[in-house]
């Protein structure tokens, strides 16, 4: 983790590309311990393979089934997991990562790219996310509607008005019904 922080500081121009930041972090660690730095490419391949072995919350697939056909669904991430590589990828119309867009949430450009990709005005998009700054405030600042999914029941940490909050995705279904 420490090397990832150092790489971010050394390469601010790729702050949005978590995969390359992580690869460079692996490279830095390999070099530090006297290993061939070219191994960083194989390490990132392995990392990304295991990155996509996820366990979903029990409410995820049921919610996606409910939404499918009623709404266009997009995945928007600052990370390097691609929802289209998962079994639930079939429910999504669009997947966008900060690596593809060139900026990361909370930058408005991320949210506006979703609007363009879905061909829906950004004012008509509801963004559901778990990060108060990157997801909720970022979406609101970009002109989208936002819901905070707060599974841990934390207090709202920002000075801005509390957003609509849900504890799990069954509450999203209730909200939309």
Regions found by a protein language model. Give the residues of each.
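N-terminal helical cap/lid subdomain that shapes the substrate entry/recognition surface
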Residues: 1-58
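Asp-based, Mg2+/Mn2+-dependent phosphohydrolase catalytic module
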Residues: 35-37, 61, 65, 71-177
């Amino acid at each position: 983790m420490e090397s990832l922080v150092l790489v971010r500081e050394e390469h601010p121009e790729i702050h949005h590309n978590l995969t390359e930041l992580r690869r460079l972090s692996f490279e830095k660690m390999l070099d530090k311990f006297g290993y061939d730095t070219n191994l960083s490419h194989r390490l990132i391949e392995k990392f990304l393979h295991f990155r996509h072995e996820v366990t979903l919350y029990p409410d995820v697939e049921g919610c996606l089934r409910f939404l499918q056909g009623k709404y266009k669904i997009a995945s928007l991430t600052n990370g390097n997991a691609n929802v289209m590589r998962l079994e639930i990828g079939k429910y999504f119309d669009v997947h966008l990562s900060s690596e593809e867009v060139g900026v990361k949430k909370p930058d408005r450009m991320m949210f506006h790219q979703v609007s363009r990709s879905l061909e829906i005005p950004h004012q008509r998009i509801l963004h559901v996310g778990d990060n108060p700054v990157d997801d909720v405030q970022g979406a609101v600042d970009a002109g989208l509607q936002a819901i905070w999914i707060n599974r841990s029941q934390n207090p709202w940490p920002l000075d801005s008005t509390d957003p609509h909050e849900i504890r799990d995705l069954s509450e999203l279904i209730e909200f939309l019904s």
